[in-house]
Each structure stands twice: as structure tokens, then as C-alpha cells.
């Protein structure tokens, strides 16, 4: 069993106030920030310091560009900005989707067949949009 790591330090981002950690990933952490103008909650994905060199940084930049191109789809989060923090780590500011994720909902409640079909259609539509843009997931 692998020990869970601590979250990286959230970067200082002008016009944004750190709120809390949302999740930890293999090459990036995601934080909740409060944006000053316009006032709204945003999710900020930050590349880990250990991933600053080589392929991970290129993949991160590609992800930001691809997500921005796909943001017009209602089931794909909107990218607001992508920058480099003062500490040298790239970050992506994106729409924050509050509420439980699908995995958490599945563990806590029974999802009806009708709801599962609606979710499947929305997911399929998002994947189709990505495929039409040349993205394979």
C-alpha cells in the first residue's frame, strides 16, 4: 500500500484567494480558490514541482489548450486562464463544479436507470466532441 502524499503548497495567484485542497493527482494538485473579479469559486490545477521538466510540462500545456478548445461543450469545464505562477509552476484556472462527483453519488445513493441513461448520453456527447477535435481519451 502506498502512503498518501501531502498536497503541494498552493501558489499565490493575483486576484485569487486560496480556500482548500480539492484533490491530488499523479502530476498535479487541484485547489479551490475564490476569484476576486468577477467573484466566483474556481478550481485551479497546478503542476507538481517535480514535474516541471520534460514531457509532463508539455502535456500540461497541451491539456490547457485542448480543454480551452473544448470548453464550449456543456459537459466539459470551462477554462478561464492558464499561466505560470511566481514559483515557476504552470496552473490552469477553470470552472469549479460543486457537489458530489459521479463516483461519490454512486457510493451514496441508488441511481435510477433513467438517470444513468441521461448521464451516459451527456458523457458520450462530451467524448464525441473531444474525438471530433482529435482528442482520444
Predicted regions and their residues:
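Protein kinase glycine-rich loop
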Residues: 19-25, 30
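Flexible N-lobe loop architecture of eukaryotic-like protein kinase catalytic domains
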Residues: 23, 62, 71-75, 86
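Conserved N-lobe loop of protein kinases adjacent to the ATP-binding glycine-rich P-loop
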Residues: 34-41
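AlphaC helix of the eukaryotic protein kinase fold
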Residues: 46-70
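A short, aromatic-enriched beta-strand patch in the conserved N-lobe beta-sheet
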Residues: 81-83
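Conserved short submotifs of the Hanks-type protein kinase catalytic core
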Residues: 87-101, 105
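Activation segment signature within eukaryotic-like protein kinase domains
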Residues: 119-120
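Protein kinase catalytic-loop region centered on the HRD/HxD motif
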Residues: 123-135
Amino acid at each position: 500500500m502506498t502512503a498518501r502524499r501531502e498536497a503541494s503548497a498552493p501558489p499565490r495567484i493575483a486576484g485569487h484567494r486560496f480556500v482548500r485542497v480539492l484533490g491530488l493527482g499523479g502530476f498535479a494538485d487541484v485547489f479551490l480558490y475564490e476569484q476576486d473579479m468577477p467573484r466566483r469559486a474556481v478550481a485551479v490545477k497546478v503542476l507538481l514541482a517535480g514535474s516541471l521538466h520534460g514531457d509532463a510540462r508539455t502535456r500540461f500545456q497541451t491539456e490547457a489548450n485542448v480543454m480551452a478548445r473544448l470548453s464550449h461543450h456543456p459537459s466539459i469545464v470551462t477554462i478561464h486562464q492558464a499561466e505560470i505562477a511566481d514559483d515557476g509552476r504552470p496552473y490552469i484556472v477553470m470552472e469549479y463544479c460543486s457537489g458530489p462527483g459521479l463516483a461519490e453519488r454512486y457510493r451514496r445513493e441508488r441511481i435510477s436507470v433513467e438517470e444513468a441513461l441521461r448521464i451516459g448520453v451527456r458523457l458520450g456527447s462530451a467524448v464525441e466532441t473531444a474525438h471530433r477535435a482529435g482528442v482520444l481519451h
